[in-house]
Amino acid sequence: MTLSFYTHKNHTREREREREREREIMSTLTGPPVPPSPRDDAVQLHRAFKGFGCDNEAVINIIAHRDATQRALIQHEYKYMYSEDLFKRLASELHGKLEIAVLCWMHDPAGRDATILQQGLSSYTVNLQSVTEVLCSRTPSQIYTLKQIYHSMFGVYLENDIEQQTLGDHKKILLAYVTTPRSEGFEVDRELVERDAKALFKAGEKKLGTDEKTFIRIFSERSRAHLVAIDSSYRNMYGNSLKKAVKSETSGKFELALLTILQCAHNPAKYFAKVLHKAMTGLGTDDTTLIRVIVTRTEIDMQYIKAEYQKKYRKSLNDAVHSETSGHYRSFLLSLLGPNR
């Protein structure tokens, strides 16, 4: 029993180390070869705030080149040295889109997701697209942590806010997705895959109307690997992709949730490349989405997103962002995106 317990713990630690190494490879974050101490960074930031106006360039040169752990240590040192909250000082010194982007970046990943969700579920700033994107693109372990952080930050359960601010089948899929345990492994039960593909066909394209309950059950209970296998089986049996079936059988925010879950099961980087392109297409730029995606994915898989963007749109993501933004706001986002290669 004891040996089994420690073996399991060792395997868990090894998986975490592998994920950490993978994140480092996929991240676009660049930093100095020998990072200054958090204390030195705190001193330099304090200097940047002094005098007439804020030295935005100095702030970007530090903040945009430190990882989540380093940023947390800088905030701790700043508070200790100057008896002042760095987050609040940044909010008072920066303005406009640069302020929004930097403050979003200063959070740790789970705290950032919780903040995005809380703002998206607020009666004053409701943004169900951002809520759907964040919830339906995160892994079960990320959602588990996120729910705990959400409650500790805002004193209310995430499920309660979803219940209050969403409607119908959109509400049902979000609640099911954040409360149902799912495997993060790659094991697939082929018999169950075939049964699920048949059930989805029977619930959608085969009948007049749609049995939304079946879509909600399967999309919320099955792992990403299992959903990818269902899609392949569905295509083989019925000559149509599951994505097309979802588009023809559902609509609105419910459709958005199902498509986000399915596309992130296949290829999260490709999904986010599409989201970024849409944010920069048409009249004006959707800066809220641009900031949210770049800031939340920089330390996770932005290298992959950049590659998918280049592949699909024949233009680098850096060039696209450069043409749609300006000033220090542009400099900050491009710093997060790393070299244009």
Question: How should each PLM-predicted stretch be described?
Answer:
Residues T2-R23:
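Intrinsically disordered, low-complexity terminal segments enriched in Ser/Thr
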Residues E22-R341:
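Structural signature for extended repeat/solenoid scaffolds and their inter-repeat hinge/linker regions
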